[in-house]
């Protein structure tokens, strides 16, 4: 016997309509391209989203058509989120740090008909426009007067386009299974793969993260995680639904600019990758400043080191919350929130707990399996391939012939993890980053975190490279705080207090910078390729 409840599709137009009625005065703060800080409301942004929907309709955009963006976290990009998906088209956010060849591949694979870009990215698009097979119109997200001379074909000003349109627009009735957005994976091996989200998955994820992260209507949230990466972790959608203040940092992600926004808007929650927070902490420490309003810093993309967790707590009274997920998961899967258990622990034990990736949100199931696909015990010791399933987790890559899940519906994340008896999940490493040496495993993440507890180490990266006897051995790359090299023996002696001897790196290489992707993740594949003969030559 079925229940007698109403059927009601979970769609982005429903979220927009809700915000128009109840969250219209919610604040949207945005740093614009000229550096100015703009304040508007969700009500005003929705009016402009309706204008955009009207304009796109006149440009021939219909249900399911793809509209791409290459843009920073700003007010126009926010309007695009809802104008595109709200009309039933597919919002395709593009990572501007893809190589030109990858951009061409992705735009052609997605068959984007319209491309909306910030003026910053005009040179990037000029270099590839002749290779784009489907893009008919390029919209530059600025006033016409501020757009530099360029050679783009069939281009127009975003503001001029909207100026001609009416704010009257009737959002369509969509099935919740209609596609809403498209995001491509990082593509470190082979071509990037497309992940096509639905309205249902997007809304369910947005509702869930608000409760899990503790967002309230009185919150002020600053996502440094880019809007071109997995929908900025779903925060823009959650903001519209819940009405909290959304603070968008634009292109200025330096410590001074972020601190200015935090202070001016009394931001209480920050979201981003560890490399961004490393720069912010350095700036604040150098200036002797404290973030008075921030109480939570959500970290994802890569593991936050113990030293960062400690610094946010001791210097800013802010709790660093680890989250974990991936593009295929919309992205959030687990989160290590401020539970009563965590807050009751002695400080040092709490910091250690905070280094873990946390507990699955409702809607996400996790398990680890061995090489025979047998589920491993949740004992905090056994580690194996991490698999997931849930309503906002991908089943099949965009345009792929075969599902990406196994026969039981589980998706293999490519991570190696351990699950503790209380359900807390800890990433041991990416499967491709685990160092296999003499039949044993070394976690590059654990070795990096051990190095980062040294008082003069700013950033660390560990990769496995071929070894003539042991298959692979670790190389440790370091950036020091003072820019000077440290005696390698000192580093090894320091590490030996934290790891077993056979984990010690075969070489330590001091560098001025490490390669990062657009989302802040270390590009270990670049280092592995560059140094693949390093130990073979010794």
Predicted regions and their residues:
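Structural core segment of the AMP-binding/adenylate-forming
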Residues: 15-17, 58-59, 86-160, 482-484, ...
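Conserved AMP-binding/adenylate-forming core of the ANL superfamily
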Residues: 28-74, 78-82, 99-104, 157-160
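Conserved beta-loop-beta connector loops within the AMP-binding
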Residues: 360-387, 421-422, 484-488, 523
